[in-house]
Amino acid sequence: MAKLVLIRHGQSEWNLSNQFTGWVDVDLSEKGVEEAKAAGQKVKEAGLEFDYAFTSVLTRAIKTLHYVLEESDQLWIPETKTWRLNERHYGALQGLNKKETAEKYGDDQVHIWRRSYDVLPPLLSADDEGSAVNDRRYADLDPNIVPGGENLKVTLERVMPFWEDQIAPKLLDGKNVIIAAHGNSLRALSKYIEQISDDDIMDLEMATGEPVVYDFDEKLKVLGKEKLGK
């Protein structure tokens, strides 16, 4: 029986300042570091042992993974970083203060941008200096693949090939896996794993630094789900 642990990165500096982050590479806040270390202790206390680890190419998720693995004495396990586990790209909203954006466009519109399954945010042009096209961590990607903005539907479509090619085969082989990623890439995975509807996924919250443990049978049917609370 394989186990999968999903953990959203600890609080980031832009979580703290209430800014849209997306693909911007923001570090953990002091609280975020504490959350990640505490999550590692929870993992250790629960006796969870992993065979493989996956994370995004963004610092806040990578550091969270490393803190969790270090605290649980598993820093040595194989680790893969991929852009496919990145946070949802928030387009032209990235860097904006959420409260100020709501005051400008209205609470309802911002809620739709943040939580709707299939509504895109205002897009960021590839010519913009903040475009990920200019970031060397994506240099090997076709520029046409690099997004200028995503909704949860597009995020799921981005995540799924990696799930099917890299993660699911390991779980089917009975291996235990940990994924440290982001609120929306993990919401996308949870939607698929739990078969959550397009409407209900809007209400799913992923708390920072909280490990979520799934137990699967040999066909990847979910047998149980548990949150290792703070």
Curated annotation (Swiss-Prot):
Residues under site feature: Transition state stabilizer: 182
Keywords: Gluconeogenesis, Glycolysis, Isomerase
Binding-site residues for substrate, renumbered to this chain: 8-15, 21-22, 60, 87-90, 98, 114-115, 183-184
Catalytic residues in the record: 9, 87
Major enzyme class: isomerase
Pathway of action: Carbohydrate degradation; glycolysis; pyruvate from D-glyceraldehyde 3-phosphate: step 3/5
Annotated catalysed reactions: (2R)-2-phosphoglycerate = (2R)-3-phosphoglycerate
Signal peptide annotation: none
Role, per record: Catalyzes the interconversion of 2-phosphoglycerate and 3-phosphoglycerate.
Protein name: 2,3-bisphosphoglycerate-dependent phosphoglycerate mutase 2
The species this protein was found in: Lactiplantibacillus plantarum (strain ATCC BAA-793 / NCIMB 8826 / WCFS1)
Gene name linked to the record: gpmA2
